[in-house]
Amino acid sequence: MGKPKELPEEDKQLAKQAEKALNNENDTKKSTATELKNLVFEQPIEFGYNEEFRAFARVSIKNHHEVYALDSLQFHDYLFQLYDEKTQNVLPKLTYDSVNEYLATYSRVHGQQQNVVMRVGINQGKYYLDLCNDQWQVVEVTKDGWQITKDSPVWFYRTNDMAALPIPNHHGGNQNLLELGSYLNFKSDNSLDLITGWLMGSFLVNSSRPILVIQGIAGAGKTTASRLIRGVVDPAKQKHSISRPKLTVDSLAIDAIHQHTLVYDNFSAGTITAEISDMLCTMATNQSYSKRALYTNSDEVLVKLGRSIIINGIDDLAKRQDLLDRSIILEIEAPKKRRT
């Protein structure tokens, strides 16, 4: 992962001020903020931050680990539940805000930079796939095979919309893949081979991935095909695809931060401007996007935006040569017989 980035000086000062404020309490009575802070540090919890200096916590719960962003609803609920269980009192909002800010700063100052990823990660030559189930099970893949584990060295972060993948079958074959092909009405005979290549590319880490472009007439089932293909590697609970009336570079970057696989529905040739085309290529080739660092006015960080991408529409979408070179383009036909 390389040498961790140097923390902005103002964050270091903020940490000192926050710690001093929390510890400057009356000797005879602890504040609720200090009480909550002490409760947190009594738990089996590890703090760190990602390449954007966003703070994360890795919490040991029962026989597995869960990773929360400190600015997420999951960590909010974790702190409220912890305080309720230990004190049988309601956690005041001001106390939560104060302690959360302290912990976020603590994570960036005292924690280590971590490889925080969604769905797929790599560590020391081993690949890891987050199944996103309630047991927080992960598939560990090596050159010798694969196994299910709950103790991944990779910090897997989840969004609320990520759905679970099934437990892999050691005795499985390609029958399910062939069955998938039977639901997809693509024109070319080698379409399933190309889709298989795209699916395999979706599991790559720190590498370029092809963009899957699905084109066809209205009613051909482009949206359904996109959802089915995405569901093999990165199923969603509700947000199976993204449809925006106006696409911008910033909206693409935000989408990439929150999803491992991006499906853009009902694109038109006019949607893919030169700027958007360049950004799609940046995402497909795992290049970096520059953005302002948290809590600073001038510092910037480079965010890796390597993502798996599917776009669909009626028009010829990949007209610019750089986007065309990075795309698998498939034509889909309207189904001759509807499945009901």
Annotate each predicted stretch with a short phrase.
Residues 61, 145-258:
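P-loop NTPase catalytic core of nucleic-acid-dependent motor ATPases
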Residues 67, 199, 229, 263-265, ...:
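Conserved RecA-like P-loop NTPase ATPase core
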Residues 204-206, 253-257, 272-274, 300-305, ...:
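Conserved catalytic network of the ASCE P-loop NTPase/AAA+ motor domain
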Residues 258-261, 288-290, 304-309:
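Loop/turn-to-beta-strand initiation segments
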Residues 261-284, 314-325:
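Conserved AAA+/SF3 P-loop NTPase catalytic/coupling segment centered on the Walker-B
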